Amino acid sequence: ISCAKTMASVLHQLCNEIWFQGIRMVSYHRRRNHPSAVAYGTQFRGGVMMDFKEGEVLYFNKPLGWTSFKVVGHARYHICRRMKVKKLKVGHAGTLDPLATGVMIVCTGKATKRIEEFQYHTKEYIATIRLGATTPSYDLEHEIDATYPTEHITRELVEETLKKFTGEIQQVPPAFSACMVNGKRAYDLARKGEEVELKPKLLVIDEIELLECNLPEIKVRVVCSKGTYIRALARDIGEALHSGAHLTALERTRVGDVRIEDCLNPLDFKEWIDGQDLVMSDGL
């Protein structure tokens, strides 16, 4: 009975927090005219017109090869074109590498103030990892620089090793990353051939699951906290297996409650936004 009361109290507090946070990521509604265009319930404000200056939150499925900056620029261009304005504040809530695909949250206008909030939501990834070889960037951006034995690796060993990466872990970010080193981006220094030393960061891996094991390739599902580099996780898994590893594919399938199926391909954004009713703003 005591446990039941405690659980009820926790659930009550949680529900209150969700309510006072404006439903946050839990409640969202599908926009008209496109099955993959999703917006927060708080965005409707009693109507269906979109007000990008006041603030809208858009969900995109970033294509392979696109930078996060390109997704933001593409959205900004077509929004400004429709609104007939020269500028609009637009930003994203979490970078994806060019070789990764998946969920990107893009905020406009006053909604950009919520970017930090969105960044702290849990993220889910599907990662394909090649064992037995490494690259300087821990992915396919660079050529293989070393090979390692894999004959000793079995499915059972992989499953046991993955268990070591759940909970709080220390992770050293990749040298080819946006981390700052003495006021400069780490990737700028790394591309110049300079040695980059980055300090380990405390992260949380909520879940890690082996989906496929076709050695020397494995596919895993990872649920993790803000700041986790899946490329670095692949590196660490390889080392823990007394081998090497690098990432060959990565898809971000969820951010908070926003799933990949809720997202719009940026290539479809022009057609979608041309079918929407917008609040037209002056003086931007």
Go through the PLM ranges and name each one.
Residues 12, 28-29, 33-34:
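Intrinsic-disorder-associated, low-complexity terminal segments enriched in Asp/Asn/His/Tyr and depleted
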Residues 18, 39-284:
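Catalytic/RNA-binding core of pseudouridine synthases
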